[in-house]
A protein has these predicted regions:
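Basic, Lys/Arg- and aromatic-enriched nucleic-acid-binding interface segment
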Residues: 41, 45, 64-119
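Basic/aromatic-enriched alpha-helical hairpins
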Residues: 1-37
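C-terminal catalytic core of Y-nucleophile DNA break-rejoin enzymes
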Residues: 78, 145-189
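Short, charged phosphate-coordinating catalytic segments
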Residues: 56-66, 112-135, 222
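Flexible coil/turn residues that form the inter-helical turn or adjacent wing/linker of helix-turn-helix
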Residues: 37, 104, 115, 198, ...
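N-terminal DNA-binding recognition helix of tyrosine site-specific recombinases/integrases
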Residues: 2-9, 35-69, 120
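C-terminal catalytic core of tyrosine-transesterase DNA break-rejoin enzymes
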Residues: 60, 110, 114, 120-121, ...
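Catalytic-site neighborhood detector that most strongly recognizes the C-terminal catalytic loop/helix
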Residues: 83, 144-148, 180, 228-235
Length: 235
């Protein structure tokens, strides 16, 4: 195990007293995994989390006098933000599939790219969630599922309006309803057929909304953050 290797590397011993596990030990372990073992920060955090569980048990059994993790904060893993470029988004919009279900999934994904809605929010949209303001702009008014906070999104782009019109039917729901698992599976097929190597998910669609759609149209970052339902701009 990594912890045994580290102890031998640092102390040239197979074991050490638990009371030697202080804050510096954790920091050194983190550095060792990064530099000597070339681990990613995600992997490092998992290994440190396992050590934390051992310390928790040791504390309960009074085998250690203090908690070395008291001041420790896991380091943030750098994640690559994935979103579609304008060219990729245009390619997706222009593509017509022979399969009706693929066209439906494509349309729902594009709708998300132009509204920033999550999966459950999008597929639970009802006609009653749409309201027009004094200027005639159509808005979505709904509660965000994760936080149960009300949110509103103006439909300022033609794409979501065209999609709503396309699927206007007797149903109370705005869009075709597709299970999450099936939706994601068909998104893979769509990406493959277009030669897009990025993973298409609702998360990718929200990032596309924030970057390609909003920021590239010179919409202020504060507005982008608000439309995505973030309490902080950095989220």
């Amino acid at each position: 195990p990594a912890i045994k290797d580290f102890i031998f590397f640092k102390y040239q011993k197979k074991d050490i007293n638990l009371n030697k596990l202080d804050f510096n030990f954790i920091e050194d372990f983190d550095y060792y995994l990064k530099t000597e073992k070339n681990n990613s920060q995600v992997t490092i955090n998992k290994k440190i989390q396992r050590l934390k569980k051992v310390i928790k048990v040791a504390r309960k059994q009074k085998l250690i006098d203090f908690n070395p993790f008291e001041e420790h904060k896991p380091k943030q893993a750098k994640t690559k933000i994935i979103f579609l470029t304008q060219d990729e988004l245009d390619k997706l919009k222009e593509k017509e599939f022979q399969s009706e279900i693929l066209n439906k999934v494509r349309d729902c994904y594009i709708f998300c790219c132009y509204t920033g809605l999550g999966y459950s929010e999008m597929f639970s949209l009802k006609k009653s969630d749409l309201k027009k303001d004094e200027d005639g702009t159509l808005w979505i008014y709904k509660e965000r599922q994760k936080t149960e906070r009300a949110f509103s999104i103006p439909l300022i782009f033609s794409e979501p309006l065209d999609i709503i019109e396309k699927y206007n039917s007797e149903s109370e729901y705005l869009l075709p309803r597709i299970s999450n698992q099936y939706f994601n599976r068909l998104l893979k097929e769509i990406a493959f057929s277009l030669g897009i190597t990025k993973k298409l998910t609702h998360h990718t669609a929200r990032k596309t909304f924030a970057t390609t759609v909003l920021l590239n149209n010179n919409i202020p970052i504060e507005t982008v953050s608000k439309l995505l339902g973030h309490s902080k701009i950095t989220t």
